[in-house]
Amino acid sequence: MEHQATLNDIQKAVWDGRLPLQITLSPSESRSYDKTDPYLISYPRISYLPSLLPRLHAFFSSSLIEPTSKPHDGWFSFEGVPLKWHLPVGLLYDLYAGADPASKGSGPASDDETAEFPLPWRLVVQFSDWPDEELVRLDADGMVMHDAFINSVKEADFMRNGTAKGIMTLSKEDSSGLWKSVQDVDLPSFQRISNILLPPPNQPFRNVPIRFFLPLPPDSGAPSLKVVQSPLPPTLPPSSMAASQAAISRTPQPQTLGTALHALLPNLFPSRRTPVLAKPVLHGAVLPMSAPVEEVVRSSAYGDGWVYIVVRMMG
């Protein structure tokens, strides 16, 4: 019971996490070019940027060169890079602005990981020139965003249970309520519905829904992000040395973040216990390699049920 309480405390801390944003209207769309006042907000890390579009459109309406634009025409960018609207804002920050200063230029390294990109995180919003090659268009009713979220929930449900029957059999009210609870950052309502989908604590997942994001160098000629995903059981398979040792005690050994990273990315994580070349980052914090992956998912998943870990190079 005490262990479960600890996981619940971690989940509450995750949902309480916020990120200060400073959002400016693109100078190309502003009547006053770059003189428009920015929009400042402390925004939940688990939330999605499109939820801000109605209030941003209203805030910038008097400055828009094209006042006939609609809120759902809006899209966000950071340093000229369009931001994927289906990813939570906390993940986007960890990907694009949370890199070590040593990897962001020729200046001396600093212990302050936000030295290169001090908070608030500065974003640009535009309501025209949608980047069709990089982003799927949104709609006025918000159904595109809703459907993308639910599809991601289905994928996570399938990973955990080997079937998406749980989310498919949710009532329409609960399905809509799950998305609304994330939009409203309403953890009690979210827990009530998500607990229907999660196996009970004494029943292990079939696989854990985790994706690893690998930022690539700008001159790689490839997309700026690479995603690594593979079925990860919550306990070590019999072929591993640790599992062989566990066979003696007949106690399954938990799959830790270190064993998972070593199996999937051995060149970046040659050690199962200690980060040597890279480190795993979730919700802006470096995770311990000893963390059992199922506990990480139960306590620290985003609203869609996935854990999105950013692999950040060291040094």
Swiss-Prot record:
Transmembrane segments: none
One GO location term (cellular component): mitochondria-associated endoplasmic reticulum membrane contact site
Annotated membrane topology: Peripheral membrane protein
Keyword Transcription belongs to the record: no
Cross-linked sites for Glycyl lysine isopeptide (Lys-Gly) (interchain with G-Cter in atg12): K154
Mod. after translation: Conjugated to atg12; which is essential for autophagy.
Keywords recorded for this protein, A-Z: Autophagy, Isopeptide bond, Membrane, Protein transport, Transport, Ubl conjugation
Gene Ontology BP term (one): autophagy of mitochondrion
Entry-linked InterPro entries: Atg5, ATG5_HBR, Atg5_HR, ATG5_UblA, Atg5_UblA_dom_sf, ATG5_UblB
One Pfam family recorded for the sequence: ATG5_UblA
Compartments in which it is found: Preautophagosomal structure membrane
GO MF annotation terms: Atg8-family ligase activity
Primary site of residence: membrane
Role this protein plays: Involved in cytoplasm to vacuole transport (Cvt) and autophagic vesicle formation. Autophagy is essential for maintenance of amino acid levels and protein synthesis under nitrogen starvation. Required for selective autophagic degradation of the nucleus (nucleophagy). Also required for mitophagy, which eliminates defective or superfluous mitochondria in order to fulfill cellular energy requirements and prevent excess ROS production.
Oligomer and partners: Conjugated with atg12.
Family, similarity comment: Belongs to the ATG5 family.
Protein name (record): Autophagy protein 5
Lineage, broadest ranks: Eukaryota, Fungi, Dikarya, Ascomycota, Pezizomycotina
